[in-house]
Amino acid sequence: MNHLWLFIVTVSCIYLVYGQGEESVPCKVKFMGTACPLGRLVCEEDGDCLGVNQVCCYDGCGTTCHNKTTTLIPSTTQPQIQPIIPSTQPQIQPIIPSTQPQIQPFIPSTQPQIQRIIPSPELLCPVVTVRYAFCRFSTYTPCHTSNDCAVPGMKCCPDVCGKRCKFPINSTDHQQFQQTPLKPTVPLPQYQQTPLQPTVPSSQPPLQPTVPSPQSYNYKGACST
């Protein structure tokens, strides 16, 4: 019995000194943290293990058979920190939505644009010759500028009832249609009225009305007695 315990202590010292069975994979792990259970002596060498890929390892409490490719108990040692090797591949940056308004790219339109013809300043509006007219605003289309005219080439010109779109004329034609200025009217001669003279009473006696006499009447045709 004493030889058995001496053998166990000797094997334990060999594992501690030489790295637990020549640095085999399952023998790296030690059984630590709790009390050792009884009956941990299972093998003395790898040949005592029944498995093909098993080795006889010391786990901290005794010698047991373990597979070469598995570990008995998770290691309590700290994991090794691997050095960070900078990658040569470009890193994909995460897309962060921007709070600023995005500027839309300008895309030229394929549809033909309608060019509005604006009359040149040399073209003038025709002269308004009618001074008075009945304005029917139900059929009257006013304008403010030449851009309001729907027909190309027309110009917003003054009219009797306001402004409306008209075709302009050249400056030479405009002078021909200018209205001749009215001549100043000559005032009519004023006739002075003669004031009425007050009537003076006459010194002659007033005329008496004549009364016809009975003899002056014509009795022809009267009844005879």
Swiss-Prot record:
Component of the acid-soluble organic matrix of calcified layers of the shell (at protein level). Residues 27-68, 117-169 form the WAP domain. InterPro entries: WAP_dom. Residues 188-201 have a biased composition (Low complexity). Glycans are attached at residues 67, 170. The keyword Hydrolase does not apply. Residues 203-212 have a biased composition (Pro residues). Residues 1-19 form the signal peptide. Keywords: Disulfide bond, Glycoprotein, Repeat, Secreted, Signal. Pfam families: WAP (PF00095). Its main location: secreted. Disulfide bonds join 27-57, 36-61, 43-56, 49-65, 125-157, 135-161, 143-156, 149-165. It comes from the Eukaryota. One of its GO terms (cellular component) is extracellular region. One of its GO terms (molecular function) is peptidase inhibitor activity. Residues 213-225 have a biased composition (Polar residues). It is found in: Secreted. Residues 176-225 are annotated as: Disordered. This is Perlwapin-like protein. It comes from Lottia gigantea (Giant owl limpet).
